[in-house]
């Protein structure tokens, strides 16, 4: 997870109806996140040849207050997956901004328990990549830390064609995290995300870490209006 400071004027036009931007200590973030999905099921049914695959997404953070409850969530700007069928299902179920490109991933063990993780995709002739190298053992999330803010968002929101928003719940345990000794995002930011993200994402990240991950359940969405 590579995290970048972003200005409000960049993110405000992308916020779905009924939610507000979520800050950590007064700062707004966008994150470039790589995942490896395993044993994926849609409505409880495994899809042959589509159960294990990587994803790389760009997201930012929002919140919604409902009857005294604060629901912290994410909004995806772009999500890359390696198969068209995966992108099609996600767009149909959640209207998520998925795009299918050739992708690959690698996990390389290093000395003293460290490892390197890489996700790569090919938008044209050249491969571009997101990578990170860990050091030290994993640790629990610290309360009120930036890592906790980035990982502890259990709702997803996205705009719908009629102007409303879709809200869906995501369930997983708290993730342990690894510190990162180096991280790289070698990508044509303008070509992938648009010129508006150049200044915020085409630079050294504010922070980077790697999470262990776990089983994740994504629930059916419901419409939200302001």
Question: What function would you assign to each model-found segment?
Answer:
Residues 6-58:
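Glycine/small-residue-rich interface belts in oligomeric ring/scaffold proteins
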Residues 1-3:
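Short amphipathic
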Residues 57-226:
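Internal, well-folded beta-alpha domain core
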């Amino acid at each position: 997870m590579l995290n970048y400071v972003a200005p409000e004027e960049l993110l405000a036009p992308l916020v779905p109806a009924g939610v507000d931007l979520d800050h950590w200590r007064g700062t707004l973030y966008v994150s470039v996140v790589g995942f490896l999905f395993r044993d994926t099921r849609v409505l409880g049914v495994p899809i042959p040849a589509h159960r294990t695959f990587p994803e790389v997404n760009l997201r930012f953070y929002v919140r919604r207050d409902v009857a005294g409850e604060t629901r912290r969530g994410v909004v995806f700007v772009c999500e890359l997956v390696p198969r068209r069928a995966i992108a099609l299902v996600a767009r149909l179920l959640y209207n998520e901004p998925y795009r299918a490109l050739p992708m690959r991933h690698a996990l390389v063990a290093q000395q003293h328990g460290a490892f390197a993780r890489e996700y790569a995709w090919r938008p044209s002739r050249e491969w571009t990549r997101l990578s990170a190298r860990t050091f030290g053992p994993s640790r629990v999330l610290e309360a009120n830390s930036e890592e906790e803010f980035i990982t502890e968002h259990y709702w997803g929101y996205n705009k719908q064609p009629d102007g409303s928003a879709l809200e869906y719940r995501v369930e997983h345990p708290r993730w342990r995290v690894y510190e990162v000794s180096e991280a790289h995002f070698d990508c044509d930011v303008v070509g992938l995300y648009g010129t508006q993200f150049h200044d915020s994402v085409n630079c050294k990240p504010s922070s980077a870490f790697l999470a262990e991950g776990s089983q994740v359940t994504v629930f059916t969405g419901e419409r939200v209006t302001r």
